[in-house]
């Protein structure tokens, strides 16, 4: 087919109208034009009539003028995939942004793909150990599952996702892909340098790197922020299909994907739905989330940070995301205000695989006992606030004392938060976590002070800290 050429007729911010003489390009096709000597990619969003298409720009449109020639590439945005992307930072259209020269890829892949059909999907459940006590015990992650980290502004989503990258990606033998969607450029820069330091990215020999980075940060136009998650996912899908291994796919932040979709929707003149979001919110989210799945070839384990506007979990953006996830880790401002980090809410967080058939009877029972004590403490808090601790029965006083110890024991120092805490991070094996909490619930450590349980690893660390505290007091 002869390639179609058109010209720009109108530019409104990130929306560009292009008129063609002959064949109109299909919806989602990529068009190319030149802006100030740089390639600018436009994605077709609507057919308007009079041989005109309305497109969304994937980069800044300053400098475009009416009459500029545009050519149709004949297909969707194609990005480089495979080993050539390892150790590199790409943008939404697959161009390198790390000053490391062109990406020498032998393969490219369209960013819009169909989700695997039912017959191709795999359903095995196996726990993915993170080394973080509160997660492994109460809301365990599954290999090949979708995991969401929900939280408002400043409660520690990015720190938690960085720690998960630190704990899982560094010891993970396969590949990882990190998609930075509408977040701070500084954080993306820090992550790259951290990965170089830890040897996950090897700048001297990129072929030995284990991670590919795809960034579309806060300063990008909405078109780029809306599509960059798909670019990252496309790179991850190729690793899954080609290597047959478990690929880790980190997204920070999935809310920005929805937010960018809402901006684009308004620019295209669609009537907004609830709270000003796009009417296609569930469709957009579903089209992306259904592609993140495990097939008979390999699996993608995705960990997604989800910003919660105004700490309201019923907001349409986080509420739509909930439906797609296997495990949800909810970060709570009330817990972060107590100084307990990670500020995971042990009663709000849950997981599909917290089931005796998957994690075993002992793990399941300990997790439920811990939640039971914390739930009882929560229901007693009103009485304590009004009447004080003295009015409680002896049994309730014991429950409160244990709950406060458990609450503090769920905190843990992180490697990536060393600058804040001044102490080295700790990773706790799952067996230790279960054994430690089982003993605390049973009352074996009722004699130790609350402070000994704060910011430590396993129960041995608690005993050592209690001895130190006793020595200091003496």
From Swiss-Prot:
One Pfam family this sequence matches: ATP-synt_ab
EC category: translocase
Membrane topology: Peripheral membrane protein
Gene Ontology molecular function: ATP binding; ATP hydrolysis activity; proton-transporting ATP synthase activity, rotational mechanism
Key words, A-Z: ATP synthesis, ATP-binding, Cell inner membrane, Cell membrane, CF(1), Hydrogen ion transport, Ion transport, Membrane, Nucleotide-binding, Translocase, Transport
Keyword Transcription regulation: no
SUPFAM superfamilies the UniProt entry points to: C-terminal domain of alpha and beta subunits of F1 ATP synthase, N-terminal domain of alpha and beta subunits of F1 ATP synthase, P-loop containing nucleoside triphosphate hydrolases
EC number annotated for this UniProt entry: 7.1.2.2
InterPro entries per the UniProt record, alphabetical: AAA+_ATPase, ATP-synt_VA_C, ATP_synth_F1_bsu, ATPase_a/bsu_AS, ATPase_alpha/beta_chains, ATPase_F1/V1/A1_a/bsu_N, ATPase_F1/V1/A1_a/bsu_N_sf, ATPase_F1/V1/A1_a/bsu_nucl-bd
One cellular component (GO) term of this entry: plasma membrane
Localization terms from the record: Cell inner membrane
Binding-site residues for ATP, renumbered to this chain: 151-158
Catalytic activity: ATP + H2O + 4 H(+)(in) = ADP + phosphate + 5 H(+)(out)
Family: Belongs to the ATPase alpha/beta chains family.
HAMAP family: ATP_synth_beta_bact
Role, per record: Produces ATP from ADP in the presence of a proton gradient across the membrane. The catalytic sites are hosted primarily by the beta subunits.
The protein's assembly and partners: F-type ATPases have 2 components, CF(1) - the catalytic core - and CF(0) - the membrane proton channel. CF(1) has five subunits: alpha(3), beta(3), gamma(1), delta(1), epsilon(1). CF(0) has three main subunits: a(1), b(2) and c(9-12). The alpha and beta chains form an alternating ring which encloses part of the gamma chain. CF(1) is attached to CF(0) by a central stalk formed by the gamma and epsilon chains, while a peripheral stalk is formed by the delta and b chains.
Protein name as it appears in the record: ATP synthase subunit beta
Gene name as annotated: atpD
């Amino acid at each position: 087919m002869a390639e179609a050429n058109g010209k720009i007729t109108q530019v409104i911010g990130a929306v560009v109208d292009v008129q063609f003489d002959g064949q109109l390009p299909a919806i989602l096709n990529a068009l190319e034009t030149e802006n100030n000597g740089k390639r600018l990619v436009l994605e077709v969003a609507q057919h308007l009539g009079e041989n005109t298409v309305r497109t969304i720009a994937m980069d800044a449109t300053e400098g475009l003028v009416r009459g500029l020639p545009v050519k149709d590439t004949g297909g969707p945005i194609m990005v480089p995939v495979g080993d050539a992307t390892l150790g590199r930072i790409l943008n939404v259209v697959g161009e390198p942004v790390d000053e490391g020269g062109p990406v020498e890829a032998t393969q490219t892949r369209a960013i819009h793909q169909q989700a695997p059909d039912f017959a191709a999907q795999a359903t095995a459940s196996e726990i993915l150990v993170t080394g973080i006590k509160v997660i492994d015990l109460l809301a365990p992650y599954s290999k090949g599952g979708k995991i969401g980290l929900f939280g408002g502004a400043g409660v520690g989503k990015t720190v938690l996702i960085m720690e998960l990258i630190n704990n899982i990606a560094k010891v993970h033998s396969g590949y990882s892909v990190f998609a930075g969607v509408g977040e701070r450029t500084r954080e993306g820069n820090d992550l790259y340098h951290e990965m170089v330091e830890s040897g996950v990215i090897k700048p001297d020999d990129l072929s030995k790197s284990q991670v590919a980075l795809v960034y579309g940060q806060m300063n990008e136009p909405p078109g780029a922020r809306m599509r960059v998650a798909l670019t990252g996912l496309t790179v991850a899908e190729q690793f899954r299909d080609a290597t047959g291994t478990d690929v880790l796919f980190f997204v920070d932040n999935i809310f920005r994907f929805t937010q960018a979709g809402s901006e684009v929707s308004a620019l295209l003149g669609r009537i907004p739905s609830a709270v000003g979001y796009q009417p296609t919110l569930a469709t957009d989210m579903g089209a992306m989330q259904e592609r993140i799945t495990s097939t008979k070839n390999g699996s993608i384990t995705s960990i997604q940070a989800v910003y919660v506007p105004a700490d309201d979990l019923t907001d349409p953006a986080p509420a739509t995301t909930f439906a797609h996830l296997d495990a949800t880790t909810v970060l709570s401002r009330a817990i972060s205000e107590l100084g307990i980090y990670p500020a995971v809410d042990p009663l709000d967080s849950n997981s599909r695989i917290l089931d005796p058939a998957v994690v075993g009877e002992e793990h399941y029972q300990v997790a439920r006992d811990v939640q039971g004590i914390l739930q009882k403490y929560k229901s007693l808090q009103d009485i304590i606030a009004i009447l004080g601790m003295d009015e409680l029965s002896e049994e309730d006083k014991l429950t409160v004392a244990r709950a406060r110890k458990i609450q503090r024991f769920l905190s843990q120092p992180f490697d990536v938060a060393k600058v804040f805490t001044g102490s080295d991070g700790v990773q706790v094996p799952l067996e230790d976590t279960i054994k430690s909490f089982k003993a605390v619930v049973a009352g074996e450590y009722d004699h130790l002070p609350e402070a000994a349980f704060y910011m430590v690893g396993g129960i041995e660390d608690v005993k050592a800290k209690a001895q130190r505290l006793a020595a200091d007091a003496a």
